[in-house]
Amino acid sequence: MMLKKALVCGAGGFIGSHLVSRLKRYGYWVRGADLKYPEFSKTTADDFRILDFRELSNCEKALEIGSGEKFDEVFQLAADMGGMGFIHSAECEIMRNSALTNINMIHASSKNDVSRYFFSSSACVYRDMNPEESELNEDDAYPAQPDNEYGWEKLYAERIAMAYGRRFNIPIRIARFQNCYGPEGTWEGGREKAPAAICRKVAEASNGGTIDVWGDGTAMRAFTYIDDMLDGIIMLVHSDLENGVNIGRQEYVSVDELVKIVIEVAGKNIQIKHIEGPVGVKARNFTNERIKNLGWESKISLKEGLSRTYSWIKSQVEKKSS
């Protein structure tokens, strides 16, 4: 029996590296490709290529495989991205680098007869909303009103993937991720997202100390643990769901509540100091009915996921300071 072959673009990143491991567990032959190897663990990919997807020729190299063979599934997760601070400070870089990557990869895939193509989009394609509003469904991405350029680029990339899918008869599967977190994600340097940044600050703070939090702490968010997100990706790819599909845990908390959960799992007594900084939208709540109809559900509570993530980040902080 021939093994299914998968190409994971962005396999050096957080979700991509975890996805490689999950696909290997399912018996795939996996090639990973990215600008860098995974930072915290050795890749489990059968083959790994260091490639810059802003060049079309590199996308073609990623798709090179034996004569008469092709990739059954291409997972496009490569992107120039980070937390809210990075998104607001690097708009041009995000739009240029990610747009080139997405244009080139879907174009190369269309020329290489791939059987199925997955694109990782984001809840950032949706507009700002008030916490008391009804949850957004997938159709509410239009009329388009993303609040930042990262969201606009994601929406454009969705459309170009779907256009190529129609022209070349490629099944396209698109996930709109809610915030994803977990061990082995970026936790320092400016590109880390809120859960990792907060875990780092709490780990570094002395008991009885204070940590800085951007904004007034009232912005509402939902966060999805990496294992749950991977379940959703696999289910979506093997389904017949077209267009963007929301994947995310519907456990909404304010930023201050998020901080307090991390402080609790750390077993510390720490005060919050609000400071000026980019905070993004007030809220972005969406419905998960389409992915839930496939049998998906989030199994890891926010507290449990943050406990696992905090333990890992604490070990990284201790390792760096030793």
Could you tell me what each predicted segment is?
Residues 84, 119-135, 149-155, 167, ...:
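Conserved catalytic-site region of short-chain dehydrogenase/reductase
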Residues 6-26:
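N-terminal Rossmann NAD(P)H-binding glycine-rich loop of SDR-like oxidoreductase domains
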Residues 145-173, 197-207:
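Active-site Tyr-X1-5-Lys
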